[in-house]
Amino acid sequence: MEKELRPGRRTSASLLGKISVVVLKTLAALVLIALLAVFVTSVSPIYDFAEPRPFSGPDIFNPYWDGGDSAFCWKRANFHTHTRVKGILNECEHWPDETDAAYRKFGYDIVTFSNHNELTVHPYDPLLQVNVYEHGYNLFKYHKLVFGCSDVNLFDHLVPLFASQKQFQLDLLGKESDFIQMNHPLRTIGTSEDHMRKLGGYRIMELDSGKSKENEYWDWALSAGHYSFGLANDDLHFPDRSSAIAVRCNFLCCPSARYEDIRKTLLGGCYYAMRVPDYGRGDWEVKYERNRTFRRSSGSASTDRQSTSPCRARPTASR
């Protein structure tokens, strides 16, 4: 005959059973809330995308033909820059003034602060203010830089799986801004060749953000008739790491570092994007010196830099 449980053991078993029930109910509630959040944020119009139309016509568009005095116009820039912000959610430990100062040591003329879902005020000069933020807190890392907006749009799809959802975001953000950059499509889960042949409404694609190269994605879009220029940015989170800062940049033929001139240049295409070696590999003095030398000679050829043109030689699209 089986021995009966002692009172103390019966109490422990009963307590464990109750705890298990509470844990299971809590997990079920969390799963239900997560599914509800995904469902609520998945709403978007269903798009009937037009068939891809490759560029055609007798002319080749040259974005450099009206570049002005090319001997003095070039300005080095990084547009995808994270800094410390007020609050507990931070992706960088350094404030905007510290991050800006770090870039200036390498000869950068333009630094814009693109924190997640937040407009960052320029730390010392209102004339250099550029309203830009990185949109997107979704699980698939479908991120965009939104330029020239007056406020932050917090709507997002938690799981932007379909092309219609992605296009809806581009359309929504495009109505509230001057232009949009599509960030690191290679690192965006679910972004396929089919999506790139459908999506439109962005003016710039991030071709290199330090962790990935998106030339294939850019080519898919261009081949389908979606014309855009390309930028290379550090996507900086750690200005104190030699391998993370001043390894991607863009040179703009731009009269000033003010937003109105930056916007005109980026939309007109008179710039080039490039990768830069991590000079010194941790030796900061070597890195500073090589970048200063590199900056002074930016208008001439250099064997230790790898540049990618933001404009392919493609005919203008027929209207």
Region annotations inferred by a language model:
Residues 8, 42-185, 190-192, 198-200, ...:
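A metal-dependent hydrolase metal-coordination microenvironment
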Residues 125-126, 195, 284-289:
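Charge-rich, low-complexity amphipathic helices
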Residues 1-71, 238-319:
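C-terminal functional module detector
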